[in-house]
């Protein structure tokens, strides 16, 4: 080799990389930067061209909380995800994402003030001249304006998705003690292509943060018994205030404790006790969340709950109604275009939901086709109960639960038969790493002698911080009362508004905390330590993954509750937490099996590499659709050609670029797919009107006004163009007839 120094450098670098990933313990600190880097490389949007895409216009541009200076920073708890009040909400109460978005905007405001007060005027003039030369006619944007754009806001998604991947790595290493399994788990999750919508789209931050709460709740199970309920409480509360889907953590966290306690605490597993303690922590978080949401965001009841049950209803029906009234979920919109299952009878609705589930699950494994929209008639209501996809979906929803139960029983049987002597847990205290960094020595005799002491004090400080921090947080949240801006909202009738007084919530939390401290202390202090334990992690983790998949998907399935949308890929963020556990185990098993083959053992790395490369490649390609709104809707309508909404939105983006003939063609496709959709008729008429063909537009306008008589926005849009082209008077009689008819 002509350049031996280059060869030596590459060899040394390769050895360091191998040591980092195969020898160094796969802790959260070790996985932090690799997972965030991978997240950024796969999902970051193209800065020069990206703009507000899909729901981002409503979430950022149209959000009153973000754009009106009359709102204080803390007022996020009194508004829904879109910044709307309780009487105008569509049921999405997620204050944590709004706090993040507003925080970035306020950071821009403070930064702009520093610039205005400290940058010389001559520099500002020079910058303005440079900006004008590069962007003629465009005003200079301020920092707050830049912070409101989708690109800086979506950096939150990239960061927290990487954090979730790092948590996966750390938890997998804690359970398996294998670097291979740990890195496969984190990489499988971060590269899951079906999550592209949640990570690349700004609105997906709710799903990402909800997933963060779920992963933190799982990580909390590794803490000591008297700390664990407090950590679970905080984690679940974070998830719930980020997205309502985190409600699945209430049953799933105890299941995880039941399945994994013997691996996380091999000397004192106490399965049932730890599962009970985690249930207390998660249930208390759920109760506090519901009570605070009702206090801060007093919405009305859905119409189906506002009416009483029919005489003769079962006791179970009465209990369920009482629970739903107490839960007090804001009414969800029901639009046949976004969710065709709203008009389907219960049996066909379940069949359609099973079909959607089967298709989504196939995308998790083989994401060849991905889309940002699946509106009517792409996912129509089925006309028959039994067909291949409904049967497959039902089997994949019920089968994993039965398989998980069988795996759990088999794991218990193996645990009793095959035990190994306990190995001491190697700790890596943060303080030791910090001391080694300051002394510039990876091994220092005096530091290594103090490692157990440093680890003990770090653990104690962490436990005290978790217990007292959680208690302080719960108390402070419970002291925040309702807002005057919401005083006239909500149900005033007592039978529709079940509320607990704040002192009762305080008492409940205090008694629960004391009970958890007492029981947890008994477990850690009096439980007889084991000297042997089962170390096989595969069956319990696989069982948890299967249960997690089904249970976490069920709230999104449209079986129990009809959602505003029939299908969305971002809704798979929670279920993919479960599929990741199973897929990582399969990949590691495939690698190990291939490694044993005499001829092909050296190529075992191909097994996980092919799968992860395909997933990462599809994730990257799908993220390129977020370059701008035109590309997004073009790729969407190509992926789901039967979605009327995709074609119509693509036509709007074409019209914004004055490509009128193409807009007309796409509008007509949308109209053909959804002939009863008022918006498609009006938008087609508006296209013809703006093309200078107002005579042809009237037939579409008239049909659209007749099909959507209460949609003022559509009516104003049509009348405006008719007025501009001096054709409004020509149709005055017909307009008055429509007005009288409706």
Language-model segment annotations:
Residues 2-683, 690-692:
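Polytopic membrane enzymes that build or remodel cell-surface glycoconjugates and lipids
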Residues 666-674, 699-710:
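Long amphipathic alpha-helical scaffold regions
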Residues 265, 597, 711, 728-729:
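Alpha-solenoid repeat scaffolds
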Residues 713-728:
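TPR/TPR-like alpha-solenoid helical repeat scaffolds
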Residues 644-645, 678-679, 709-717, 742:
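Boundary/linker segments of alpha-helical solenoid repeat arrays
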């Amino acid at each position: 080799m002509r350049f031996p120094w280059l060869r030596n450098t590459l060899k040394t670098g390769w050895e360091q990389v191998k040591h980092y990933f195969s020898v160094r313990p796969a802790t959260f600190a070790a996985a932090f930067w690799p997972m965030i880097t991978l997240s950024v490389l796969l999902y970051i949007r193209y800065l020069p061209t990206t703009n507000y895409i899909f729901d981002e216009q409503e979430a950022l541009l149209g959000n009153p909380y973000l754009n009106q200076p009359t709102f204080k920073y803390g007022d996020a708890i009194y508004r829904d995800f879109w910044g709307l009040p309780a009487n105008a909400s569509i049921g999405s109460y997620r204050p944590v994402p709004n706090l993040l978005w507003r925080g970035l905007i306020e950071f821009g405001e403070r930064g702009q003030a520093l610039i205005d007060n400290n940058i010389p005027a001559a520099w500002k003039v020079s910058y303005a001249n440079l900006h004008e030369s590069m962007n003629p006619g465009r005003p200079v944007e301020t920092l707050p304006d830049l912070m409101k754009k989708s690109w800086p806001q979506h950096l939150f998604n990239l960061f927290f998705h990487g954090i979730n991947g790092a948590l996966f790595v750390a938890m997998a290493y804690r359970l398996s003690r294998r670097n291979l399994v740990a890195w496969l788990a984190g990489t499988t999750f971060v590269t899951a292509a079906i999550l592209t919508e949640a990570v690349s789209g700004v609105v997906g931050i709710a799903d990402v943060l909800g997933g963060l709460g779920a992963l933190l709740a799982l990580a909390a199970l590794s803490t000591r018994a008297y700390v664990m309920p407090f950590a679970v409480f905080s984690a679940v509360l974070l998830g719930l205030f980020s997205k309502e889907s985190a409600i699945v953590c209430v049953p799933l966290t105890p299941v995880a404790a039941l399945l994994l306690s013997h691996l996380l605490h091999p000397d004192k597993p106490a399965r049932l006790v730890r599962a009970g303690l985690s249930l207390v922590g998660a249930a208390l978080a759920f109760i506090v969340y519901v009570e605070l949401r009702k206090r801060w965001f007093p919405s009305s009841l859905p119409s189906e709950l506002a009416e009483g049950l029919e005489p003769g209803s079962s006791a179970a029906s009465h209990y369920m109604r009482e629970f739903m009234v107490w839960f007090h979920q804001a009414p969800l919109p029901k639009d046949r275009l976004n969710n065709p299952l709203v008009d389907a009878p219960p049996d066909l609705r379940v069949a359609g939901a099973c079909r959607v589930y089967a298709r989504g699950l196939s995308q998790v494994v083989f994401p060849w086709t991905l889309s940002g929209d699946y509106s009517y008639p792409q996912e129509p209501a089925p006309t028959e109960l039994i067909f291949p996809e409904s049967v497959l979906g039902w089997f994949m929803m019920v089968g994993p639960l039965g398989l998980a139960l069988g795996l759990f029983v088999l794991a218990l049987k193996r645990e009793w038969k095959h035990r190994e002597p306990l190995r001491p847990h190697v700790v890596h205290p943060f303080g030791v790493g910090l001391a080694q960094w300051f002394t510039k020595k990876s091994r220092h005799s005096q530091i290594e002698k103090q490692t157990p002491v440093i680890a003990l004090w770090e653990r104690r400080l962490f436990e005290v911080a978790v217990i007292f921090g959680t208690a302080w947080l719960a108390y402070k949240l419970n002291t925040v009362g309702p807002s005057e801006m919401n005083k006239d909202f909500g149900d005033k009738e007592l039978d529709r508004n079940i509320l607990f007084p704040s002192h009762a919530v305080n008492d409940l939390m205090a008694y629960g905390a004391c009970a958890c401290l007492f029981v947890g202390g008994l477990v850690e202090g009096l439980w007889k330590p084991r000297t042997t334990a089962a170390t096989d992690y595969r069956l319990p983790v696989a069982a948890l993954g299967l249960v997690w998949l089904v249970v976490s998907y069920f709230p999104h399935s449209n079986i129990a509750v009809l959602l505003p949308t029939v299908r969305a890929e971002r809704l798979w963020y929670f279920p993919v937490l479960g599929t990741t556990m199973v897929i990582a185990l399969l990949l590691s098993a495939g690698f190990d099996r291939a490694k044993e083959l005499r001829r092909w053992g050296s190529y075992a790395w191909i097994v996980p590499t092919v799968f992860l490369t395909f997933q990462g490649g599809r994730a990257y390609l799908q993220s390129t659709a977020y370059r701008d709104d035109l590309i997004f809707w073009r790729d969407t309508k190509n992926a789901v050609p039967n979605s009327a909404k995709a074609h119509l939105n693509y036509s709007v983006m074409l019209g914004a670029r004055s490509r009128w003939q193409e807009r007309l063609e796409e509008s007509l496709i949308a109209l053909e797919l959804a002939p009863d959709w008022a918006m498609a008729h009006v938008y087609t008429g508006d296209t013809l009107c703006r093309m200078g063909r107002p005579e042809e537009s009237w037939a579409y306008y008239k049909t659209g006004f007749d099909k959507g008589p209460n949609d003022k926005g559509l009516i104003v849009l049509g009348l405006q163009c008719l007025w501009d082209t001096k054709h409004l008077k020509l149709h005055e009689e017909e307009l008055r007839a429509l007005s009288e008819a409706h």
